Amino acid sequence: MTYTSGRILGSMCTSSHPLARRVYCDFLESNLGDPGLFRGTRELESGVIGMLGELLSEPDAAGHIITGGTEANLMAMRAARNMAGAEKPEIIVPKSAHFSFRKAADILGLRLREAELDQDYRVDVESVRKLISENTVAVVGVAGTTELGRIDPVEELSEICLDEDIHLHIDAAFGGFIIPFLRETGAELPEFDFKLQGVSSITVDPHKMGLAPIPSGCILFRDASYLDAMSIETPYLTEKQQSTIVGTRTGASAAATWAIMKHMGREGYRKLALRVMGVTRRLRDGLVELDYQLVVEPELNIVAFNHPAMGPHELADRLEELGWAVSVSSCPPAIRVVLMPHIMEEHIELLLRDLEGIRLREE
């Protein structure tokens, strides 16, 4: 199965742009972990961080291109832990947070505390407030949750973290490459980026809605002091300090991401965002017409729904038999469809036809 088949419906990744693939292949023999040998790739990485910083309201942001959201979230938690210096460090994450935070807690020796969600599946701010203690080194908010595409109330989290002097990390691995462009088209979506003074770091993945090849993730910090807090000496390399988790990093991701961002421009990404939201609305409307039950109204390009009489796992099995690759969310249990750029409206019409057939057979 391929992305271009239009039948992969549960993935947050997509077909990379042909230009990005060509550039990636041209830079296979490069190593950002030893940038003195490959100076051009370091400049391209800096260019990407600069463009993302502009997009996310902090032109002077510092950061790196890395493998993806898991590594970015790990780096953010490491920076927060190192800067806080707590003896028994804790992090507070929403129950909707990505599983990578459990990995980070395990690797870094952090106690992970989960905040409750409200009725709309966004983090409950009062639950976060109650969990804060003298050991809290970071609070996490999500801009585009993995299962439902919800945007946490980051503005309120920012105020809390400013008052408490706590690192606020925003996991925008999914939302970071669509929310800003939808806002530019007039969509009423909440602020989540460095414009909010309490935000310390942001994860964003160009290999999701950015059309960059896998692996192309990014971590951005408000300033370079967060990188300094993770820096170690690398005496035998051309660069004598390193703050990333991974030592050997391909320069191909930096080059390909730089190329596709320059090629698309903000206007190109705005058009892409509007297109996927149009496909999202078509699926949403078709499901309602067929009497499927929406979990929530889509905020981004993710639709979660249930059959009125059939469990989501059984429905997923039926769809798989018909050639569709969907995923099942856990909070709450539902069929989850991510409307990535490889999914066109004609694919959704075929899906709705199959969903109608399933409904008719159950009546």
Curated annotation (Swiss-Prot):
Pathway: Cofactor biosynthesis; methanofuran biosynthesis; Cofactor biosynthesis; coenzyme A biosynthesis. Its cofactor is pyridoxal 5'-phosphate. Keywords: Decarboxylase, Lyase, Pyridoxal phosphate. PANTHER family: PTHR42735, SPHINGOSINE-1-PHOSPHATE LYASE 1. The modification N6-(pyridoxal phosphate)lysine is found at residue 208. GO terms for biological process: carboxylic acid metabolic process; coenzyme A biosynthetic process; methanofuran biosynthetic process. Its EC number is 4.1.1.11, 4.1.1.25. This is Probable L-tyrosine/L-aspartate decarboxylase. The gene is mfnA. Transmembrane segments: none annotated. It comes from Methanothermobacter thermautotrophicus (strain ATCC 29096 / DSM 1053 / JCM 10044 / NBRC 100330 / Delta H) (Methanobacterium thermoautotrophicum). GO terms for molecular function: aspartate 1-decarboxylase activity; pyridoxal phosphate binding; tyrosine decarboxylase activity. It is an enzyme of class 4 (lyase). It comes from the Archaea. Catalyzes the decarboxylation of L-tyrosine to produce tyramine for methanofuran biosynthesis. Can also catalyze the decarboxylation of L-aspartate to produce beta-alanine for coenzyme A (CoA) biosynthesis. Belongs to the group II decarboxylase family. MfnA subfamily. SUPFAM superfamilies: PLP-dependent transferases (SSF53383). It catalyses: L-tyrosine + H(+) = tyramine + CO2; L-aspartate + H(+) = beta-alanine + CO2.
